[in-house]
């Protein structure tokens, strides 16, 4: 191994300290060797929920026990790792490309072996195909929710205030700071608006920074509720907002639409498809989509939503019809049962 490794270093990393190269390659390969030495339980099918190391373990089980592999990706794991590696300070710069190629190699293996590969929405399926997965293997199985929990929630009475909700963990990936800045700008334009941020603190440091930002800006009518019963709290809301910088198919948006509440979201994951419809969906627009981290765009979109109750109600009804047609819990279970039967 050391002879091979030395040759690789001389050929590809002549100006990188040997210790950096050694520990990087060790970190990359040791988990793979541990996994390949694992005893995988016997199963009728191995269903991985990501590529990467989990996908490798599913491939090992398939190879040892001669059983089919299924892959479900809620996010495109390889792309997520690529973005993380590009931004990371802990990765030796000269090894970033090798780390990225390593994760692409792992995804190629399970894409090749899998009997079927599912994603949550059409653009994710296109990404899987672009990354080398056989199009005939790829199908979309969306998330599903229990519509009955939300469909009869009454609309909030028109009391002169517009109440905006955000069902969100306080974590950097949710970009709550941009939400706070955008709401501050909105409140300067429309004084009778309130923002309810509903969710637990996922990152204590980030949560403290969000509270400090509210104090620094002097934002009024912003409520951190902590964790709440979303079904009960939805009665207090006119519409919802999501400002994440990365998502798959957010359940919070589906639940909001199921409750006849339109949404303002960033253009991440499946959000545009949820609010504007996939090909063949003619229900119409159920909210507004803005670029991530764009404060003014978010404030503008919220203002448009705030200024017309009739528009909010119409958009909410469109969203509820979309959920009732494409995103039911029962449909999701039936689709996965059919997939298991097919194997």
Segment roles from a protein language model:
Residues 33-42, 77, 94-117:
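Membrane-proximal helix-turn-helix segments that form the acceptor-binding/catalytic region
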